[in-house]
Amino acid sequence: MDLGISGRTAAIAAGSAGLGLGAAKALAADGVRVAICGRDAAKLAAAALAIGGDVVTLEADLSAPNSGREFVENATAALGHLDILVTNAGGPPPGTFENTDLDAYQAAFDMNCRSMIEMCRASIPAMRERGWGRVCAITSVGVKQPIGYLMASSVARAGLTSFLKITAREVAADGVTVNSAQPGTHWTDRVAKIVPDKETAASSVPARITGDPDDFGAAVAFLCSEQAKFITGTGLLIDGGQAAGLLD
């Protein structure tokens, strides 16, 4: 299916590995010129080879103040303008109510909420002026069904989801859509650190498999497509049936 985005430009945060890399590969395969960021130069170089084509790589630590804004500004300068923004960042360490302290909540907010808001504020105004834009935030199934052992992550990303919903309504008339892709258990380096055995990780998923980052990337690319112009303010669960709730 032609997604209608060939020739567009995109910035994908934390695009050097995992779900961000899956999104970058999918967008590039559809003819989008991409810029990615990450903290490790070697991983960025390897990701650029995996993505193929003319990839802009930028070093950035999204836990640092203003890093989200700076990434978007640098990506825009390199690409000329920005049509598509995929926000993404590594998740906080596991923790429950009992062992998650206030500093952990602050760190999670800075990484998984504030940096995303910075990126949106730096990119959406120009999208509105041009009359076309796509924002897709990679969040978590935890915003629909909170994960007890990922307390800080679930709290921070739930706050981001409210921001996305409100922003989507505000900018919809200007041709800009704002959505989120909400992954369940995908086999990434982060998941492997929490649950080292792949079969054990899959056992909590009704589909009894773990998600593939490349499949996830294809879903993100669709949300960023021309065909998805009537989809905004929503969260797409990509979770193998993990979330059991009825309501969005």
Name every feature range the model reports, one short phrase each:
Residues A14-G18:
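Conserved glycine-rich cofactor-binding loop
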Residues V86, A172, T177, I231-G233:
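Short, small/polar-rich loop/turn modules that mediate ligand/substrate recognition or access, typified
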Residues P125, R169-E170, K229:
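Alpha-helical segment proximal to the catalytic Tyr-Lys
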Residues Q145, A221, T232-D248:
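Short C-terminal tail/terminal secondary-structure segment
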Residues V205-F216, Q227:
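A conserved structural motif in NAD(P)-dependent oxidoreductases
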